[in-house]
């Protein structure tokens, strides 16, 4: 898909289609008014007849509008002008792209980026249009023998900006939007792969492929033998019953002018399949446990995005690859594990395994002397119950870091909601036999999981994103969403001091 920006009048555009907005009730946007004037009232006459009300997502495709050079004009319902917000804007873009794809318009000039969206500038509107377009066109058919093909797919989209001085802003928005989209695409591809293909070694191979393209990215791996020497007994216990070796992939991106600048560390939980182990999960929807590596998929996608943007920042990405299976060699409820930090954990449930992997990684990354650490994981079903599929759960022991992440979520549209991490919850992890248990009971499950992790993140500023509800969709639209790539990438853009809006 090719994107560009221009600034010009709609009637002068030579294109297969131009896209303009119509507000409710039957009120032309400024650009649509220009077309109506040049076509001597052709569009307003259609609206008076009731062909389009202007409700959000309504579409009306016109052919050969008088005095307009474009072959087609697509009128897009935008709802009430004062109510056009971020969510509605992205929904309109998605519906527009789907319609253009169906009409056979291989190229189009889109004027929807000139609509007024509350509190958002041209940069945001163009970038979100790029990301939304790419996301709506995504299709995972790598393993299908018959691939669905659109007869004449949309190949080129031009976004119009109000003035020529905003062209540079629009170009920057496209560049950033394409990088984020590229990262989301990789995240979705990796996460959607079946577990017989996507195992910890596959995660490592995907990281190496990325390093072959980008010279400032270096990839190394830590296998089970090295983990044993280090004392990562908790991580090793989880993967012990699997035929696939546990592999921790370390991705080091050096983009800062000062190579000694402290890195930001991103950790992604990479359970390529989670059966629950001895505490076996129910059979229903167990196939979706291939998505338990959604955190790792998000980290590798983010690393790709920052490589493409060449952000002037140092970042370490960790893919904590592992598989949780039952066998005679599996770890058991009742086992007590000594973690890399030296703290001991009583296992109450082998299906609370993600935290047992992450706790050793949180200790391991101390060697990088990090500026800060963010771990992201499809950690708890409790977070899905609490927040559903719209917001990721955010936990942090550092208020400024939490606020930065919340802000990045609002900017990118990949929102998070901060949850408490109060000391009162820590008592729920008490064990009579070890320093702690790996399960705090049914109440506040997402919080007690974060409390567990916080015990291993005392030596740096730390945040935890629980993406169990946001990393993938179930049902008819089953598949990876590409989250949390947008929020993590936006956070790093902000940290790198890259100029964005007007």
Curated annotation (Swiss-Prot):
Gene3D superfamilies: Leucine Aminopeptidase, subunit E, domain 1, Zn peptidases
Record-level Gene Ontology MF annotations: aminopeptidase activity; manganese ion binding; metalloaminopeptidase activity
Record key words, sorted: Aminopeptidase, Cytoplasm, Hydrolase, Manganese, Metal-binding, Protease
SUPFAM superfamilies: Macro domain-like, Zn-dependent exopeptidases
GO biological process: proteolysis
UniProt superkingdom: Bacteria
Compartments (UniProt record): Cytoplasm
Active site residues per record: 281, 355
Alphabetical list of PROSITE patterns matching this protein: CYTOSOL_AP (PS00631)
Cofactor: Mn(2+)
Residues that coordinate or bind Mn(2+) 2: 269, 274, 292, 353
Main location, first listed in the record: cytoplasm
E.C. number: 3.4.11.1, 3.4.11.10
Cofactor, how bound (note): Binds 2 manganese ions per subunit.
Reactions catalysed: Release of an N-terminal amino acid, Xaa-|-Yaa-, in which Xaa is preferably Leu, but may be other amino acids including Pro although not Arg or Lys, and Yaa may be Pro. Amino acid amides and methyl esters are also readily hydrolyzed, but rates on arylamides are exceedingly low; Release of an N-terminal amino acid, preferentially leucine, but not glutamic or aspartic acids
Similarity annotation: Belongs to the peptidase M17 family.
Biological role: Presumably involved in the processing and regular turnover of intracellular proteins. Catalyzes the removal of unsubstituted N-terminal amino acids from various peptides.
Name by which UniProt lists this protein: Probable cytosol aminopeptidase 2
Gene: pepA2
